């Protein structure tokens, strides 16, 4: 078991004073079978009115609004989370069971294409080949490895609005793209797949008490009789280094910050993630 502290700070600077802004932050880690949230707080400068709710996908959302003129806005989420090294084992399912109407009806929302995970004949052909040679759980790993083989990890080559196919055409991308491309393959095979946002401590041999530059990260969940997590970017099942925050169909459902404001565009955006292993 690991205990980690994560501080995620996002700062905006506006061209001219924004007279009002309305925002949602998905920055609170989840409590589930492999991780426990000890504490979390989301704070803003300037101070705002806020409230929390759980969205459709089970992600904690902090909604806040600021109705006074402001030229800067900083949102900081501070969390302490305990994580386990291994997830509980899940039952296996056959291709025949995956193709049953009961499964298709139950998981329809995470089987359908989205703007980030569109249908593509080339990718579908890859999925068909993988499904022919692997049982479902191993097919998930094969799909992730295929996506990884097609993309070079190069930050800055894609943006938050890029789809998995955009990254495939460029042959490069970041963790968001690796996850989206993997989901395209999974859904083409009829395997329910979800996008996960969170954090990754970069050091497997992390020193207790040492603060390091962390990473916002993305990976996938697949359902093969039960949900389990796999990281296509690093080609591993997730470990205690991973902290999950949001789950959804794609990036749209888990964007860390989204909102609207009245005023001219932001001239600067600064994001800092710091992670400390506490135990």
UniProtKB/Swiss-Prot annotation:
Q: Which SMART domains match?
A: TGc
Name the domain of life this protein comes from. Bacteria
Q: Which Gene3D superfamilies match?
A: 3.10.620.30
Q: Its family?
A: To M.tuberculosis Rv2569c.
Official protein name in the record: Uncharacterized protein ML0607
Q: Specify the species.
A: Mycobacterium leprae (strain TN)
